[in-house]
Curated annotation (Swiss-Prot):
Class of enzymatic activity (EC top level): oxidoreductase
Binding site for (2E)-4-hydroxy-3-methylbut-2-enyl diphosphate: 96, 185, 250, 317-319, 379
Organism of this sequence: Synechococcus elongatus (strain ATCC 33912 / PCC 7942 / FACHB-805)
Name of this chain's protein: 4-hydroxy-3-methylbut-2-enyl diphosphate reductase
Free-text remark on how the cofactor is bound: Binds 1 [4Fe-4S] cluster per subunit.
Pfam families linked to this entry: LYTB (PF02401)
Amino acid sequence: MDTKAFKRALHQSDRYNRKGFGKTTDVSGALESAYQSDLIQSLRQNGYRLQRGEITIRLAEAFGFCWGVERAVAIAYETRQHFPQERIWITNEIIHNPSVNQHLREMSVEFIPCERGEKDFSVVDRGDVVILPAFGASVQEMQLLDEKGCHIVDTTCPWVSKVWNTVEKHKRGAHTSIIHGKYNHEETVATSSFAETYLVVLNLEQAQYVCDYILNGGDRDEFMTRFGKACSAGFDPDRDLERIGIANQTTMLKSETEAIGKLFERTLLKKYGPQALNDHFLAFNTICDATQERQDAMFQLVEEPLDLIVVIGGFNSSNTTHLQEIAIERQIPSFHIDAAERIGPGNRIEHKPLHTDLTTTEPWLPAGPLTIGITSGASTPDKVVEDVIERLFDLQRS
């Protein structure tokens, strides 16, 4: 499928919108009351620091809602204003934040039913409005919705669209796209749909395995057992790893994406030599600025003397998880929560340790003077961060 031609035709359709409906003023009040915070604004103006009693809060200097998320949520609110009577669907969570998605449900925005990973688009009728989330949607989903005669409102983050353009360049050059990401993450599913041939690697360990295979060959069946769910249909590691291009899920850890890119570059250089390297390897910077800024701010925060860190964001939020990883690497006690309600009653917290299920820790907050680091993922509203901070202050009074 010529994905570029399809996108061009879709963008010209009068049933497609990706710029909103000019109703920013109409929805600004609702957005401000639901998501903004005077307390957080005050923290920003006072060196990202706040002390009450024996608790000092130290807030990361880049955190929370990014521009792409703000844009997606605003367009979703505008869509309800523009189509007050129509049935509105969304193909997935608009962003990985439970409170934001709940607000959309309260606005009668319905979520496409999904069972065992399969979406049921039979519920969508001609003339319905369908919102594509900030992560984007696969080409196949867009094509299906277009054929159904739906009004498509596309809130895909422009940084994600940039990655799609990158993998289309890979395709035109007959390069396999090596995508650093989680193969079943919504964004990576969408990105891979624009590629002809692709392989998704989760981390540096998997990338090293692939590079060893490129240089030394190996057991093809073992390779496919390991990556069978993370590659394009008909993928052949003996054929499809001769020409590669690098892309990534925009929310991955910047340092790991860079390390993976350099590893593949060294591998192809070793195999084909400097004269032929450009024929066999393409590198593009598809790391999201907002993701990078939040990670850089977290690296700065963990250099301070902190007793613990609270990381706030959806449990399925990739960028939030990577912020937690930074705290763990520095051996700072960290607690990943998605809402203030996870704290209490009493000195108890329900949180999600890395790579495990939700757990409850009690007591979790040490006695005495404390300096607590706070950060949040790109899908977390300031209001949620405020609620967490206030809950922490409440604990010292209880």
